[in-house]
Design a protein with these regions (language model features):
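GST-like domain detector, emphasizing the conserved glutathione-binding G-site
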Residues: 1-133, 139
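Short, solvent-exposed turn/loop segments enriched in Gly/Ser/Thr/Pro and often Arg
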Residues: 6, 148, 196
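Phosphate-coordinating loops and pocket residues in cytosolic domains that bind phosphorylated ligands
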Residues: 42, 185, 194
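Conserved residues at the C-terminal ends of beta-strands
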Residues: 55, 154, 195
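Acidic/polar loop patches that form or flank catalytic/metal-binding clefts of enzymes
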Residues: 78, 191-192
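GST-like fold's C-terminal all-alpha helical module
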Residues: 96-191
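Carbohydrate-binding/catalytic loop surfaces
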Residues: 197-202
Length: 202
């Protein structure tokens, strides 16, 4: 099994967290969209990373990759057992992809003028902060156990300070701050970090 992974891309990072949490034997080849072999990028009709190759199977959508890994390597499970809980988890992951990731991508790429970037940063902070109440009820992201939803959220939280976005030290946000420190301290998360990603918080 080989994962072609960008060195500091949050989409690649979420897959690396799954690999690390499950202790899956996988060769991680760090590259970029510009330097990845054409035969690898050709697996993905959108010609970008990450790309996961397992024998004759090539996967390019991170949601598909992560659920494939969870089914192929069922221990520890990263999706809830019951259908309703699984559906809720998938809805959360979809929300992150549709509402939070586009804002994060715009800020990372510096899309738009200074005013637009400032607005995107403010909207991103608002979206992230709105999640804080959930961590009063659950130890993890809407779950009692670490799951794929945490794998989606953790890479985003890790990148915020490097983008000039700091969660306020307020009573309302404290559950989220406590949560992120708990996640960042997990051996699986630490093992998932590339050298560039590790430097984001040094």
């Amino acid at each position: 099994m080989i994962l072609y992974s960008d060195k500091d891309d949050h989409y690649s990072h979420r897959v690396r967290i799954v690999l690390a949490e499950k202790d899956i034997a996988c060769e991680i080849r760090e590259t970029s969209n510009d330097d990845a072999p054409e035969e690898v990028l050709s697996i993905n009709p959108y010609h970008n990373l990450p790309v996961l190759i397992d024998r004759d199977l090539g996967l390019y959508n991170t949601s598909v990759m992560m659920e494939y890994l969870d089914e192929r390597f069922p221990h520890p499970p990263l999706l809830p057992v019951y259908p309703v809980a699984r559906a809720n988890s998938r809805s959360l992951m979809l929300r992150i992809n549709r509402e939070i990731c586009p804002l994060l991508n715009n800020v990372i790429l510096g899309k738009g003028n200074a005013k637009k970037i400032k607005e995107d940063k403010e909207n991103l902070l608002h979206e992230i902060s709105s999640l804080a109440p959930t961590f009063k009820e659950y130890p993890f992201f809407m779950n009692d156990e670490f799951s794929l939803t945490d794998c989606y959220l953790a890479p985003i939280l890790w990148r915020l300070p490097s983008l000039g976005i700091n969660l306020p030290l307020t009573k309302n946000i404290k559950p989220l701050l406590d949560y992120q420190e708990k996640i960042f301290d997990r051996p699986g998360f630490q093992d998932s970090l590339s050298i560039i990603e590790r430097d984001l918080r040094d």
